[in-house]
Amino acid sequence: MNDSNYSPSLVSALKIARGMALQDKHNTFGVSHLVMAMFAENTGLKEILSSMQKDVGYIMEWFDTHREMYRSSGTSTEEVEPDEELSKVLDESERSKIKLGADSIDSICVFTAILREGVVYSHQQIEMLD
C-alpha cells in the first residue's frame, strides 16, 4: 500500500485501523476498521456528515457492528494488511479524489468510495446508511 497520495489524517487513521485489527487478533483489516478509525482520528469526516444532517451516531454504530463481525483468515501477526475489500476502496478513492478535486486522498474520498454502489456494499446496504 503506497500512502504517499494520502492526507496525513488518513495515514493516521490507517495506523489506528491496523491497531484495531491487531487488538482484535486479525491479520487483516477492513473497511469497518478504517471507518471507525476515521471517526476516531481528526479527519473531518464526522463534522462533514453532521453538516449534511446525517445521523453520525447511527453510522458509527453500523460500522462498529460490522467491525465486531469481521473475520480474517489466519492468525494475528505484526504485519496487518488491508483486506481485499479495503484495497478496492483505497483504489476507488483515487477516482473520488479526482472527482472531488482534492489534493490528496482523504477521509471524504475514502467514504465516497465506500458509498459507491458495488465497490463493497450493495444498494440496500448503502440505503441503510442514508
Which role does the model predict for each range below?
Residues 1-130:
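Histone-fold recognition with a strong bias for associated Lys/Arg-rich disordered tails
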